[in-house]
Amino acid sequence: MAVFVANESGVTDFDEVTLAALARFVLDTMKVNPLAELSVMLVEIDAMTDLHVRYMAEEGPTDVLAFPQDEAFEPSWSESPEEDPTTLLGDVVLCPEVARRQAAQAGHGMERELHILCTHGILHLLGYDHAEPEEEREMWKLQNSLLASWDTAAGTGAS
């Protein structure tokens, strides 16, 4: 599972290696093809604002955006990964400045918020959405379950 993290935000008070490990954990847990590739980009607030306006037609910055490589992609786990071509899942774009504000409001650290947002973005790449109430309940339940499993596996608590 290849996870590439590119920090273009200028924010450095989080662990990029841990963020990549979380992304791998989520993809493994969701049984995504082990040859899959994911990019996680962290950008400045101005860049996130531009992306949000351009791709979502919404003003202002947002916390996370997910750009699937292939809209028709169906994530799969293969018993013979060597038979599957490498799957480019897409990009998860995070904004640490927005994450920091949200973390303060939620009462936890920015790194925890980045973990929440990264997990959320990956779920969007895997086809989950929250446009309808039932979808939202399903996605949030799965997101919380994945994060709780990560906390246990990584030996961290929600912080």
UniProtKB/Swiss-Prot annotation:
GO molecular function, one term: zinc ion binding
Enzyme class per UniProt: hydrolase
Cofactor(s) needed by this chain: Zn(2+)
Residues that bind Zn(2+): H120, H124, H130
Keyword flag Amino-acid biosynthesis: no
InterPro entries reported for this sequence: MetalPrtase_cat_dom_sf_prd, YbeY, YbeY_CS
SUPFAM superfamilies: Metalloproteases ('zincins'), catalytic domain
Subcellular location per the Swiss-Prot or TrEMBL entry: Cytoplasm
Keywords associated with the record: Cytoplasm, Endonuclease, Hydrolase, Metal-binding, Nuclease, Ribosome biogenesis, rRNA processing, Zinc
Origin: domain of life: Bacteria
UniProt GO cellular component terms: cytoplasm
UniProt-recorded name of the protein: Endoribonuclease YbeY
Species name: Parafrankia sp. (strain EAN1pec)
Organism taxonomic ancestry: Bacteria, Bacillati, Actinomycetota, Actinomycetes, Frankiales
